[in-house]
Curated annotation (Swiss-Prot):
Natural source organism: Cronobacter sakazakii (strain ATCC BAA-894) (Enterobacter sakazakii)
One Gene Ontology term, aspect cellular component: exodeoxyribonuclease VII complex
Origin superkingdom: Bacteria
Job description of the protein: Bidirectionally degrades single-stranded DNA into large acid-insoluble oligonucleotides, which are then degraded further into small acid-soluble oligonucleotides.
Gene: xseA
Annotated GO biological process: DNA catabolic process
Family listed: Belongs to the XseA family.
PANTHER family for this protein: EXODEOXYRIBONUCLEASE 7 LARGE SUBUNIT
Record GO terms (molecular function): exodeoxyribonuclease VII activity; nucleic acid binding
Protein name from the UniProt record: Exodeoxyribonuclease 7 large subunit
Amino acid sequence: MPLTQTPSIFTVSRLNQSVRLLLEQEMGQVWISGEISNFTQPASGHWYFTLKDDTAQVRCAMFRNSNRRVTFRPQHGQQVLVRANITLYEPRGDYQIIVESMQPAGEGLLQQRYEQLKQQLAAEGLFDPALKKPLPSPARQVGVITSKTGAALHDVLNVLRRRDPSLPVVIYPTAVQGDDAPAQIVRAIELANLRDECDVLIVGRGGGSLEDLWSFNDERVARAIFASRIPIVSAVGHETDVTIADFVADLRAPTPSAAAEIVSRNQLELLRQVQALQQRLEMAMDYSLANRQQRFTRLHHRLEQQHPQLRLARQQTLLMRLRQRMDNALDSRMRHATQRQTRLMQRLNQQQPLPRLHRASARVQQLEYRLGQIVAARLSHTRERFGNAITHLEAVSPLATLARGYSVTTAQDGNVLKATKQVRPGDTLTTRLADGWVESEVRQITPAKKTRKKKTG
């Protein structure tokens, strides 16, 4: 007779254990929607209830460490969405589910859609940190995409006025709640990119329920944020509210006010920049004045080494040009410095840093006064030395010799007359005296008699 294989024989315990493992390993974690009934909460704090629909029911348990995170009190007959693990209670062989999280049915379905879209976009790389665009520092103009009547816009504008009142703001009004809101938000983002007038955008709204914030979990909005060439800061709801837009944006701010803080500069930073610019201005003025003074000294020394009147005149002309250039350069620097100071003071006046601004203004006035005194003293000293040099040159000038009674006579060819053989009767001669010229005609030429030396015997 052929041998027959003995079938496997399970004990009840082994059977229940095998079924439990099969359920836990094969089914894993699932989402289940249904109606609560037979809800109880013993002293242990755990929740026990039945989840049912029109044709079936299943026993459920939700342990205390999980049900503490539920934000509402479950009621009999309430429709809910739960995330649970399927298992088997071995001692009694009861099939049941262990609930990890619970939400009202409406929010639960939205949460399920949220998780599905989040996984899809993450798989496509829309959340990749390497693709995040850096924010400009500092921002030259900020765009705000939100409701024009909402509290979020009010909060953003208040923060920007307090921190950086000179920062321009462009508002792109849009609905942030309702069926039309996602399309309007997408159009606002596309419009901001088309106009290209801002270098950073704040996209967001105030707090609300999951349904209120759902526009920012819309796939169209997420893809518009990802496609934006302009960096986007998301600011949706409160710090505990996290939307799909937060994952896609280049930076997430917990609130609209925090977003305004991120994209703006504060008054202290601007004041530090003004102080640094003032220090650079003072150093540039001192350096320029020292260079001009050294150059003037060298030119004056070279001028003193020149004796002929013509060279002196040339050096005088050069000195005047250099002095004019120096004056123009100083005037130009002072004008540019004054204009820059005026612009900075206007910005500071808008931010009310009055005590430091008064001190800075007083310092600039002192420097202007000192600069005027130094330039005036240098010019006076130069004029005095230049006058002395002219007096000295005039003392040794040929004109001074003429003033003592001498004269210079030139022939018709313009050469200085040194001998009688250079002229003939009838020639016209020109004689230079100290106070003018005299023209005369030669009538007679009488050579001087040569003096003979006596012979020594």
